[in-house]
Amino acid sequence: MEFLPDPDIDGNWWPHPAFEAEFWRDPPAVDLVHIHFGFEHRTPAQIAELCRALPVPLVLTVHDLDNPHLEDQTEHHERLQLLIDEASALITLTDQAAGILARDFGARDVRVVPHPRIVEEPVAVEPGDRAAVFLKSVRSNVVSDAQFYRDIAAQVPLDVYVHGGAELASIGTVVHEPMSDDELHAAVGRAGVCILPYTRGTHSGWLEMCRDLGVPVAVPDCGCYAGQADTPDAVEV
């Protein structure tokens, strides 16, 4: 396996040229294409054009049945269907997602590969008894209604972490700058439980990080988050 360098754009995401059909007119010496993330900027027509242009087999990992960054899933599902129909091999992360792929997208022979570890060497911290929510910059796929968090705080001790400038009105928050990996792992590891206030999506690397750190997780009833549990008592819906 050879890892090719990505361009350095100050750490920002960039659209990979391999999603352009034109890229494959003079293709690199590769044996297959693996798509996992990063195609939501393409229209269904452009994805169809890509599928027609691919000179090598496609392996598709379906991480997101519903894209957490999009409110309207219509075009995402169209793109996904095109890629599923083209794929020579399909992978997803949970049995629940595999069932949905078969039921809603006609997918067959979906291989389930659980989410890989995020944290290889956890920071040693003493776990606490407080619940924690990490909202960062309050993205569009998380609950932004402060009352939601007040209701939780009325039942359990709660810490709500947000980036500076993203504070929620009339609720106490722990305001912080973006954390390093070690700082984040220590903050999560000190929580008695981590709450994921997602309104859409399918699987979560954040959930996997919590489990790597030994922290139980409360998840929403959307998506396939509960299917990522490594033990029955690890995740509560």
Question: Which sequence ranges carry the predicted segments?
Answer:
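Short hydrophobic beta-strand element within catalytic cores of glycosyltransferases
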Residues: 196, 216-221, 226
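Acidic donor-binding loop of glycosyltransferase active sites
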Residues: 186-202, 215
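Short N-terminal targeting/anchoring amphipathic segment
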Residues: 13, 23-43, 57-59, 197
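Donor nucleotide-sugar binding/catalytic pocket of nucleotide-sugar-dependent glycosyltransferases
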Residues: 88-102, 106-122
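Active-site proximal beta-strand in glycosyltransferases
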Residues: 31-34, 50-68
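Membrane-proximal helix-turn-helix segments that form the acceptor-binding/catalytic region
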Residues: 48-57, 70-90
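Nucleotide-activated donor-binding/catalytic signature segment of Leloir-type glycosyltransferases, i.e.
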Residues: 164-193
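Conserved catalytic-core segment of nucleotide-activated headgroup transferases in glycan assembly
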Residues: 126-170
